[in-house]
């Protein structure tokens, strides 16, 4: 791996750690916001806020790139919105929308700890989906997936009981997030990441708005009470974190990306501790395992073996 490629990989990994931190801390805002308004309303408003935030950012980046490259640019970057960008945005936006909705309904039936574990099972589903797409997965990444999965079990699962309808919904949520990661990996190689994120949330906003007017009652007072939660989830989680994911995945293997994003569960636990929830020995052990898995996924094992043989 060249120095430039290595630095890009490390920087992209850092961006995903930041995204995971934002997602983990968003659980607090999300929980408080959903005590005031419905699932569709919350998702619609945070998605619209993300669109408002991302539109000027994406326009600024697009105009700067056009000045730097010139009018002779061809391909997907020639126009602000292309057919391929719309297709990618629709696919990403649809999966993000339904994954978020299914997650919220799943939490209603299952405990928070079990919900966190089942949702982050996408780290196991991503390499499995990769097999069906005929992608080679390095053995070390499989080991990392196993370690991280065990770590999240110790970190999140504290309740006892059998499989519930909530568990089934959360497994579906994990699958949808895994699909979204693979879709991003497919399109981000040739599309601008910020614009892809913009279209993604525009689509999510439209879908959730339809559900909001069909299934829920819009209460302006309740929306006002949830304003800070909506702002935090809309700008930081949707606008910034999901965009960091899209941009970072351009330089990362999707399995490695999913492992880093699983840090979300660790930061969620730490955020809970900050707000008065104490970490148990099992949760601390789980945090340690997830960190080990992520660090191990970044180690160039092949290079170390070559050096040792020399």
Can you name each region flagged by the protein language model?
Residues 33, 42, 46, 106, ...:
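Hydrophobic/aromatic residues within transmembrane alpha-helices
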Residues 8-13, 36-44, 80-85, 142, ...:
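Juxtamembrane helix-entry segments on the extracytoplasmic side of multipass membrane proteins
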Residues 28, 40, 50-54, 125-127, ...:
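Transmembrane alpha-helical segments that form core, pore/gating elements
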Residues 17-25, 29, 57, 86-109, ...:
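Hydrophobic alpha-helical transmembrane segments of multi-pass membrane transport proteins
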Residues 53, 57-58, 122-143, 266-285:
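C-terminal transmembrane-helix exit sites in multi-pass transporters
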Residues 2-5, 9, 47, 62, ...:
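C-terminal-most transmembrane helix of multi-pass membrane proteins
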Residues 1-43, 93-94, 98, 102, ...:
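Glycine-/small-residue-enriched transmembrane alpha-helix faces in small-molecule transporters
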Residues 137-157, 177, 208, 282-301:
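Hydrophobic transmembrane alpha-helices of multi-pass small-molecule transport proteins
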């Amino acid at each position: 791996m060249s120095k430039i490629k290595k630095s890009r990989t490390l920087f992209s990994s850092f961006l995903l750690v930041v995204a995971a931190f934002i997602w983990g801390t968003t659980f607090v805002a999300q929980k408080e916001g959903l005590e005031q308004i419905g699932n569709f309303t919350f998702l619609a408003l945070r998605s619209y806020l993300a669109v408002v935030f991302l539109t000027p950012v994406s326009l600024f980046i697009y105009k700067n790139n056009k000045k730097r490259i010139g009018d002779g640019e061809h391909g997907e970057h020639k126009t602000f919105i292309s057919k391929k960008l719309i297709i990618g945005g629709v696919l990403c936006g649809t999966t993000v929308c339904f994954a978020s909705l299914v997650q919220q309904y799943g939490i209603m039936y299952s405990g928070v700890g079990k919900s966190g574990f089942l949702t982050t099972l996408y780290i196991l589903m991503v390499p499995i989906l990769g097999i069906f797409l005929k992608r080679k997965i390095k053995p070390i990444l499989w080991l990392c997936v196993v370690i991280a999965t065990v770590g999240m079990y110790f970190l999140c699962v504290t309740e006892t009981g059998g499989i519930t309808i909530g568990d089934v919904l959360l497994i579906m949520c994990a699958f949808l997030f895994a699909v979204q990661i693979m879709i991003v990996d497919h399109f981000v190689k040739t599309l601008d990441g910020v614009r892809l994120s913009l279209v993604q949330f525009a689509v999510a906003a439209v879908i959730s708005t339809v559900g909001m007017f069909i299934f829920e009652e819009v209460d302006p007072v309740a929306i006002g009470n949830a304003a800070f939660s909506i702002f935090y989830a809309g700008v930081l989680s949707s606008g910034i974190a999901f965009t960091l994911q899209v941009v970072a995945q351009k330089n990362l293997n999707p399995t490695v990306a999913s492992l880093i994003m699983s840090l979300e569960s660790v930061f969620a636990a730490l955020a809970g501790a900050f707000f008065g929830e104490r970490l148990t020995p099992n949760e601390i052990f789980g945090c340690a395992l997830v960190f080990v898995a992520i660090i191990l996924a970044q180690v160039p094992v092949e290079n170390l073996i070559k050096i040792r043989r020399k």
